[in-house]
């Protein structure tokens, strides 16, 4: 039995975790942030890093510090029934109902579709591409014991190779001086807050909770099994992963900001990166960009299928095996990607807006539980208040035809920051402060 991971083992797990986290969306957000921020780049980026890197790190830390086996174990601090409800809803929403189907379509829309033969229908191209993507994803997912090697040693280095191939050229031969670029929209009037909201909207804290089960099992694979040592290793790999994410975010945002003087403001970050790649590598750039996005999405999809399947096999041990769950989730994602992704996303987004505040409040309680001596009833009070407030964000994110104006109007009138999608923040902060003060007083009396 080992006491700790070697440096090489820590790097391998960190590389794997980075690969699981870092999908195409993690490139698209900072690229657009850079373009839109211009001269306000660094203050916008600071805000982005606070939530886009800080929240995922806290999610991983909450699993490590509480020595939890995964999300099911951590959310059990609220109640047994709630842990099943929250875990199922989170994994299904960020897995087969949302993020995995998007992993099929994003590389196709942003990179592969431009390489299709002339005359081929887009729907046909998507079907063929998603079939190939499905086969590769399922092949790796059915071998969960090798996920650390596949993602940590091969797919993540491949992604970084494509990424730095483009970015080094862009940094050595910048397209312009970002100091001369005028910020646009909210990045001109409130760059820090805009960056915070952009980082918040990556919703990577959910991924941090979801991928915890893979990190913990990988650490144990290397022979570290004592709970306190697993916790320490989890924290270490989380810090290394988030440092790498911060570096990649900073480079992407900087290159995006520099590109605007020559290429103009793109409609989104995917288009911006595609333009940058084609500028520096005419002809070849589209292929390099397509490969980079493909690998970025593939490794995240593999991680999500693995995490979802391991969790459901653990929650329902007498129903289906891990392999059967992996096949079912993969088929479901394949079908949604080709048939009804737009509809599914329109319903998944409101659920994500409900889940994210619940996840953040759980993380906050878990991290400070020992400090303030939180009991189960405190978890339940905090969760109930968060749920009631987050329902407002849920209703606001519903498709236009389903919104109840009386409800959203009431929430907008009562909750500060509601229009920013943060209506839960003030009341939950107040409740947390009250529970913390109560905990301190109780500890002094004990």
UniProtKB/Swiss-Prot annotation:
GO terms for biological process, alphabetical: isoleucine transport; L-leucine transport
Its membrane topology: Multi-pass membrane protein
Keywords: Amino-acid transport, Cell membrane, Membrane, Transmembrane, Transmembrane helix, Transport
Keyword flag Transmembrane: yes
Disulfide bonds: none
Ways its activity is controlled: Leucine uptake is inhibited by the proton ionophore carbonyl cyanide m-chlorophenylhydrazone (CCCP).
Principal place of residence: membrane
Listed GO CC annotations: plasma membrane
Subcellular location: Cell membrane
Residue ranges crossing the lipid bilayer per the database entry: 13-33, 41-61, 81-101, 120-140, 154-174, 196-216, 237-257, 285-305, 325-345, 347-367, 381-401, 421-441
An example Gene Ontology molecular-function term: L-leucine transmembrane transporter activity
Keyword Ribonucleoprotein in record: no
Pfam families: Branch_AA_trans (PF05525)
PANTHER family: BRANCHED-CHAIN AMINO ACID PERMEASE BRNQ, BRANCHED-CHAIN AMINO ACID TRANSPORT SYSTEM 2 CARRIER PROTEIN
Function: Branched chain amino acid transport system which is involved in the uptake of leucine, valine and isoleucine. The proton motive force is probably the driving force for transport.
Family: Belongs to the branched chain amino acid transporter family.
Protein name, as recorded: Branched-chain amino acid permease BrnQ
